[in-house]
Swiss-Prot record:
Molecular function terms from GO: ATP binding; polynucleotide 5'-hydroxyl-kinase activity
Protein name in the entry: Protein CLP1 homolog 5
Quaternary context: Forms a complex with cleavage and polyadenylation specificity factor (CPSF) subunits PCFS1, FIPS3 and CPSF30.
Domain of life of the organism encoding this protein: Eukaryota
InterPro entries, per database record: Clp1, Clp1/Grc3, Clp1_C, Clp1_C_sf, Clp1_N, Clp1_N_sf, CLP1_P, P-loop_NTPase
Organism field: Arabidopsis thaliana
Stated role: Required for endonucleolytic cleavage during polyadenylation-dependent pre-mRNA 3'-end formation.
Span of the signal peptide: none
GO cellular component: mRNA cleavage factor complex
Length: 424
């Protein structure tokens, strides 16, 4: 797989090598000389980094670099046309705001906050990439910003169908991604917010409340601020959700990525009475790869597999069993769990908590492990992780499930959504 395709690529200053990997072929890459970065993560010298299939990324250099590549790519080319200077200028302005908070007097600093940046734009505009850059550059300068991920379709922190936040204390590795150990994760259970708009808004509000409590007790997090990534759902219901998120998280800066003149105009119009809020339009990188709906589905399946096996297949998946009587499975909202009409089902009570009958229909379903003690706490509680049901034995009343952890289930309450995964 590796070896015959080894080649060197020389990058001139302020240029980048854009790479799209094939569905089945990994790639190795290392920096030989100069300095280069991926999503703001500075590459170490002479260290091979293995990128799994399906990844798309760009190796950028400010002053020139030579890299070595081992493997076959689906698409690669060098470009000197990048928006990186503008992106770095944005980072520098955020730094000024952070320093302004820390240099304030103690009394005023307690009521001031660092930048709360929310990134919006159409699908495939580079929102997540910009978020990673801003986070990594902030960490490199000694800050510990919080990343908030509201994109249930292509979640970055953990599996799809989640609304989550994580404190970023170390550089975000371009392969391993975001840390999970301190993440606050709510399970929406769907990849399309339109199916249950009220539940989506409610979970966004719950996450904002939790972060408000965290920031009130942590001056470092408060000064470092947050970077919020959103969906590429920017019209009609999607636009209403953007406005809701901007107000709920009390954003101080809305970044619109791409040539979205109407979106910029509408946001400025609808938010003109909100104090201390700026709307900024940044150009989209021409290196952003367009992804089909089928490819997005493949990515979602890959993200679920990565949760259980690890991005580099370095995790052990444990098969365990539990009695029916030791767990309770619930779903949120009145939507049909199986069948082609599930995405269009509207319930009269979108926040209704329903006990699910344990039977064969749970096989291959991904369930969230809730920290809730009682069913009425499910929506307000974060989740500990996820399991996938491998088998349901009705006669023995036992469930067989797989988990990336060998530990027993930390809670008896499990949440069912629409996500499925076939255990390999």
């Amino acid at each position: 797989m590796f070896g015959p395709q080894i080649r060197r690529v020389k990058l001139e200053k302020q240029s980048e090598l854009r790479i799209e990997l094939q569905p089945t072929s990994p790639l190795r890459l290392r920096l030989l000389d100069g300095k280069a970065e991926i999503f703001g993560y500075e590459l170490p010298h002479e260290v091979w980094i293995t990128f799994p299939p399906l990844m798309t990324f760009a190796v950028f250099t400010w002053y020139g670099a030579t890299i070595e590549i081992d493997g076959i790519t689906g698409n690669e080319y060098i470009s000197c046309e990048t928006p990186m200077v503008n992106y770095l200028g944005l980072h520098n302005s955020l730094q000024v705001q952070r320093h302004r908070v820390t240099s304030s007097t103690r009394d005023s600093a307690s009521s001031q906050e660092g930048p709360r940046v929310i990134i919006v734009g159409d699908i495939d505009s580079g929102k997540s990439t910009l978020a990673k850059m801003l986070l990594n550059w902030a960490v490199k300068d000694g800050w510990k910003p919080t990343f908030v991920d509201l994109n249930v379709g292509q979640s970055s922190i953990t599996i799809p169908g989640t609304i989550a936040a994580a404190p970023i204390k170390m550089l975000v590795d371009p392969v391993e991604g975001f840390p999970l150990d301190k993440a606050l994760i709510h399970y929406f259970g769907l990849t399309n917010p339109s199916v249950n708009l009220r539940l989506y808004r409610t979970l966004v509000e719950e996450l904002a409340r939790e972060l408000k409590e965290e920031f009130s007790a942590n001056a470092e997090s408060r000064a470092s601020g947050m970077v919020i990534d959103t969906m590429g759902f920017i019209v009609r219901e999607g636009y209403a959700l953007l406005l809701h998120a901007i107000r709920t998280f009390n954003a101080s800066l809305v970044i619109v990525v791409g040539q979205e003149e109407k979106l910029v105009y509408d946001l400025k119009k609808n938010l003109k009475f909100k104090k201390n809020l700026q709307v900024l339009n940044l150009e989209k990188s021409e290196g952003v790869f367009s992804r089909s709906s089928d490819f997005r589905k493949t990515l979602r399946n890959s993200n679920i597999q990565n949760y259980f096996y690890g991005v580099t297949n370095d995790l052990t998946v444990y098969t365990k069993t539990v009695k029916f009587s030791d767990v309770q499975v619930y779903r949120i909202g009145d939507f049909r769990v199986s069948g082609s009409t599930s995405a269009h089902q509207r319930g009269n009570d979108p926040l209704k908590i329903t006990l699910v009958t344990i039977d064969e229909h749970l096989v291959n379903k991904v369930l969230a492990i809730s920290y809730a003690i009682k069913p009425d706490q499910i929506i307000s509680s974060i989740v500990a992780g996820f399991v996938c049901i491998k088998n349901v034995d009705i006669s023995e009343e036992r469930i067989t499930y797989v988990s990336p952890s060998a530990a027993e289930l930390p809670s008896k309450i499990l949440i069912l959504g629409t996500l499925t995964w076939h255990v390999t």
